[in-house]
From Swiss-Prot:
May have hydrolase activity. It is an enzyme of class 3 (hydrolase). Its EC number is 3.-.-.-. Its cofactor is Ca(2+); Mg(2+). InterPro entries: FAH (IPR051121), Fumarylacetoacetase-like_C (IPR011234), Fumarylacetoacetase_C_sf (IPR036663). A divalent metal cation binds at residues 159, 161, 190. The modification N6-acetyllysine is found at residues 203, 234. This is Fumarylacetoacetate hydrolase domain-containing protein 2. Keywords: Acetylation, Calcium, Hydrolase, Magnesium, Metal-binding. Belongs to the FAH family. Gene3D superfamilies: Fumarylacetoacetase-like, C-terminal domain. It comes from Pongo abelii (Sumatran orangutan).
Length: 314
């Protein structure tokens, strides 16, 4: 796989912005590339905004994709813990290209109207059951990749979301057991073509959500034991530096456990599957007048404890 020049550029831009580096002993798993390495590798981000420890250099027997890593469960996680505790060389952030923490999952599950304040924004009742839709895995790109405006849509919108990554296979999972199936959390940008989603040809939710580049993820998969409370995290989105969404995951109608229990009635979850848990208020379509993304815009999606992803619109 060739290293994308666009990814290198945006990673360098992130470094140049001097986001505050927050060193930690939290487990922040990443997929990355570097000019001196062949293909994608697994690593550990050394804190929010830090460099990367090459896990495959620490243990060459480890798989090089996150899905395979998660499939091996505790065996691979224990290796990552040893690597985190060791004094290992760190690749500078400016020398690596961050990929999405999960690529080509079996499924990407999405939830509509899952924030109380987002329901209030639209003056609609809070749903009594989760409203589920999906995005194709081909829409996933890295945390600093570009979002490409498709010629088929004139109304492309932003949505910051908390994403859950599944770590253990399961079906008919009880809510009380659901967190045992979670590997961790990451930041998602659920880019949405509102004209297709809301009007075109009977309201095409799938098509409106699943154009190429419409699902940036990252920067890291933060393991569940590294997140104090996934349902009490500040969540925000900025477009060209302007704060457009600002809320807290405590506004979620259906929490992670409820969503896993509900969806697993219908489908089997596999390691690497991603659940986008809904967006808070402040999206462009409900502004007066509506505002949509245009070429040259820059969208920053941020969640407390998880990090920031930055996507330029082209």
């Amino acid at each position: 796989m060739l290293v994308s020049g666009r990814r290198r550029l945006l990673t360098a831009l992130l470094q140049a912005r001097k986001w505050p580096f927050q060193p930690s002993r939290d487990m922040r798993l990443v997929q990355f590339q570097a000019p001196h390495l062949v293909g994608p590798h697994l690593g550990l981000e050394t804190g929010n905004g830090g460099g990367v420890i090459n896990l495959n250099a620490f243990d060459p027997t480890l798989p090089k994709t996150m899905t395979q890593f998660l499939e091996q469960g505790e065996a691979t996680l224990s290796v990552a813990r040893r690597a985190l505790a060791a004094q290992l060389p760190v690749l500078p952030r400016s020398e690596v290209t961050f990929l999405a923490p999960v690529t080509r999952p079996d499924k990407v599950v999405c939830v509509r109207m899952n924030y109380v304040d987002h329901c209030k924004e639209q003056n609609v009742p809070v749903p009594k059951e989760p409203f589920i839709f999906s995005k194709f895995a081909s829409s996933i790109v890295g945390p600093y990749d570009e979002v490409v405006l498709p010629p088929q849509s004139q109304e492309v919108d932003w949505e910051v979301e908390l994403a859950v990554v599944i770590g253990k296979k399961g079906k008919h999972i009880k809510a009380t057991d659901a967190m045992a199936h979670v590997a961790g959390f990451t930041v998602a940008h659920d880019v949405s073509a509102r004209d297709w989603q809301m009007r075109r040809n009977g309201k095409q939710w799938l098509l409106g959500k699943t154009f190429d580049t419409f699902c940036p993820l990252g920067p890291a998969l933060v393991t569940k034991d590294s997140v104090a409370d996934p349902h009490n995290l500040k969540i925000c989105c900025r477009v060209n530096g302007e704060l457009v969404q600002s809320s807290n995951t405590n506004q979620m109608v259906f929490k992670t456990e409820d969503l896993i229990a509900w969806v697993s009635q219908f489908v089997t979850f596999y390691p690497g599957d991603v659940i986008l848990t809904g967006t808070p208020p402040g999206v462009g379509v409900f502004r007066k007048p509506p505002v949509f993304l245009k070429k040259g815009d820059e969208v920053q999606c941020e969640i407390e404890e998880l990090g920031v992803i930055i996507n330029k619109v082209v």
